[in-house]
Amino acid sequence: MKKYRLPKNKRLLLACLLFVSMGSMAQTIEKWYINMPDILNPTLSKQNRMELLEYHKAGQGDSIANLFKHQAYLLKFDTLNQHITVKNTPSSTFEMKILNQPDSTVIIGIIRTVCAPVCMSTIEFYDTAWHSIPLRFTMPTAIEWVDINKIPTEKIDLQWVKNLMGVSFVSLSFSDKDQTIQAKNNTLDFLSEVDRKVIAPYVSDKNLSFKLKDRTWQRNQ
């Protein structure tokens, strides 16, 4: 039986496609972190980022001086779950995670958290060409942690509670176990000791969890 062979030009095209595909698959959290545009992480240069990871891998430490001469610390470097967290400055943290999708596309998630002194986060998503992806994530508000039904309305005014929790301080993080986002309510840290004592019994200390579905991050119930 005569074997069929692809024309030479088609074989070359197929080889190129395979090469590009393999190159994309070979990219790791380390490569994405080091080679990201500096504007996304202006506190540490590309050289800083590379040296920070190289020192860690060589067992020579987990810190390096940032561009402002403060120490930056590597808090997490998980190559298995494609997750990295760096304390860029004494009051700010940078977190990156690779989110592999069922259709083989790759999403790069970035969380920036600033504690001044109460912690708050922002979150962004990028494709592998570092174009911003408009995935919808609605930051939860502090009132979502309050169990309104348990508040004794004869003693505590509900409108006072809503006003008190009207300013939200929420920090985000990527889960180590799966591709979810965890939201932590830090608003109690912003309140006076008197107000905190009144409202704290009705505020959950559990994180809220969000998963990606149809380009929207939805809260897990």
Describe the role of every protein-language-model region.
Residues T85-V86, T113-C119, R196-P201:
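Short consensus segments that form the blades of beta-propeller domains
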Residues K2-L13:
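Bacterial N-terminal signal peptides that target proteins for export
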Residues S21-G23:
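N-terminal signal peptide c-region/cleavage motif recognized by signal peptidases
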Residues V106-P140:
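Mid-length scaffold segments of soluble, non-membrane domains
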Residues K97-P117, A183-N186:
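Exposed beta-strand-loop-beta-strand "reactive/processing" segments of non-cytosolic proteins
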Residues Q27-L99:
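Terminal domain-start segments
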Residues L74-H83, D127-R136, K213:
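Surface-exposed loop/turn elements that mediate protein-protein interactions on large endomembrane-trafficking
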Residues R136-L212, N220-Q221:
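Short aromatic loop motif centered on NTY/YTY
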